[in-house]
C-alpha cells in the first residue's frame, strides 16, 4: 500500500487494466497482437491478487452484448448493491474457520512443486496471496448463494491468481485442472504418505 515509499493509509482496493502483452504464446496463436503492450515485471505482477482475462466482445452472449451496447459508457445510477455485497462478504470472510484455513494452507503448499515442475513457479508472496484469495472467493460464493464449495473456490483463485498471465503466458485449463487434482489428493495426507512423498520430491530420479 505504498507508492514510491509513501504510505497510502486509506487505500483499500487497487486494480489496473492492460492490453494482452506480446509473448511467444501470443505470437504463435492466430490472435490480434498489441505491439505496445509489454509484459509486467514479475515483482509488480505479484502485487495483484487476480490477473483476469476479459473475453473478446464477440465471445459474450447476445444478451450481454445488448446490455453493453445499451448501457456502455454511462455512469451507473442508483445503488448497484455492490457495497452491501462487499460488506456481507467481509463479514463471512472473518468467519472463515481455522479448519478451513488449515485446508487452504495445505492446498497452496501442495501447488508449489507441481507449478515449479510445469515452469510456472510462484513466490512466497503469491502463495500467501492465494491463501487469502481462496478464502475471499469462498466467502463471495456464499454471499452470492452460489453452489461452489471450498475446493471450487480454490481452483478459481489458483486459475486466476497466477502472475505469469501478466507476462503473456497462456494456460491450458486441462493442465491447471491436473495440478489442482494433484493438490487435492495430497491435502490432508500424513507426512509419511507414499503419495505425498512422491509429489513432494523435487528430484525426478528419486521420485522414480
Predicted regions span which residues?
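Canonical AAA+ ATPase core
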Residues: 2-83, 89-90
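Conserved NTP-handling cores and scaffolds of large molecular machines
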Residues: 21, 48, 52-56, 72-76, ...
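Short, Lys/Arg-enriched charge-dense amphipathic segments
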Residues: 23-39, 84, 104-108, 141-151, ...
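A broadly tuned preference for mixed-charge, low-complexity surface segments
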Residues: 33, 38, 42-45, 51, ...
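Generic detector of well-ordered alpha-helical segments enriched in charged/polar residues
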Residues: 45, 66, 70, 83-94, ...
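Conserved AAA+ ATPase small/helical "lid" subdomain
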Residues: 72-149
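C-terminal engagement/docking regions of AAA+ P-loop ATPases
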Residues: 139-208
